[in-house]
Amino acid sequence: MPIRHCIVHLIDKKPDGSPAVLHARDSELATSQAMENLLADLNESYNAKQGKAWGLFHEESGAYPFSGWLKAYLDGEQDFTAFSRQAVEHLQKLMEESNLSTGGHVLFAHYQQGMTDYLAIALLHHSEGVAVTDALDVTPAKHLDLGQLHLAARINISEWQNNKQSKQYISFIKGKNGKKVSDYFRDFIGCQEGVDGPGETRTLLKAFSDYVESEDLPEEQAREKTKTLVGYATGQAKMGEPITLEELSGLIDEERPKAFYEHIRNKDYGMAPEFPADKRTLSQFQRFTGRAEGLSISFEAHLLGSKIEYDEGRDMLIIRQLPTQLKDQLKRRQD
């Protein structure tokens, strides 16, 4: 991926209310193999993170100046170093106001992937390790720990500039379990949530379950299509790309590539044509299957606790809201 501009600054700050001290770099980093490796590893770690949110910029204001500075840089009114200096000074101020914040190296990278321009911003920390020297001595060594990436954002510059209706050109890591630690970083970017990734993913899985039921698919076909959906969505999440409903529909049924897409539109699930997949929600979407003499059962894991209840003590499976076709067959049997 071509790196257009990249720079790192350091904010020295402990989470004890002490002042944040900025050590700013005066010039951009030169492009190198090490820099390309760092950005590739950062993207890989970022894409793998669960609990990300997607959104858009707040209206530019004194509280949210970042988008204005970014626009000025992209319009050629200031260079990348000056833009990053303005931004990191603003981050330093917000860190001082947040007693929970911890400093670190702040990376700004403007790069291109395919035909799309991105800006990545991440707060990086070191971990202590060891290394073996040329003299075969063991010595302490520090390394950037991208496995502990907790504060980062990625802005799809091309989407922001070319699609004024978009509500998902920014992604950022949210604090776990409602923690407020990351709020100051979200405010630094000036981002508001625009797309509910977990909610959209849950709706997709509900629409797919309804589709499988309405098509009365054999168990093997249902299992294969479920595997296709989860594989596609997980792959998109790993690459940091959104789910595209039309593309997914074509993969689910190559002979009728519009069938699933038309099912979604006709039933009015209210889903966006594109949205980010939530990996945590996807991990819950697996099929339980079982066979015995004269019996075959298959259902999605997310139905446990709602439509399906497992009573281990009595060795029973309780099914609520039976499929219409099954009920019709049972009624005809009684008649």
Swiss-Prot record:
Cytoplasm is among the record's keywords: yes
Signal sequence, renumbered to the chain: none
Protein origin, superkingdom: Bacteria
Assigned keywords, A-Z: Cytoplasm
InterPro entries found in the cross-reference section: Nucleoid_associated_NdpA (IPR007358)
MF-aspect GO terms: double-stranded DNA binding; single-stranded RNA binding
Predominant location category: cytoplasm
A Pfam family matched in the record: NA37
Localization of this protein: Cytoplasm, Nucleoid
GO CC annotations, alphabetized: bacterial nucleoid; cytoplasm
Family statement: Belongs to the YejK family.
HAMAP family registered for this protein in UniProt: NdpA (MF_00730)
NCBIfam families (UniProt xref): PRK00378.1
Entries under PANTHER family matching the protein: NUCLEOID-ASSOCIATED PROTEIN YEJK (PTHR38772:SF1), PTHR38772
Record protein name field: Nucleoid-associated protein Pmen_3549
Species, as recorded: Ectopseudomonas mendocina (strain ymp) (Pseudomonas mendocina)
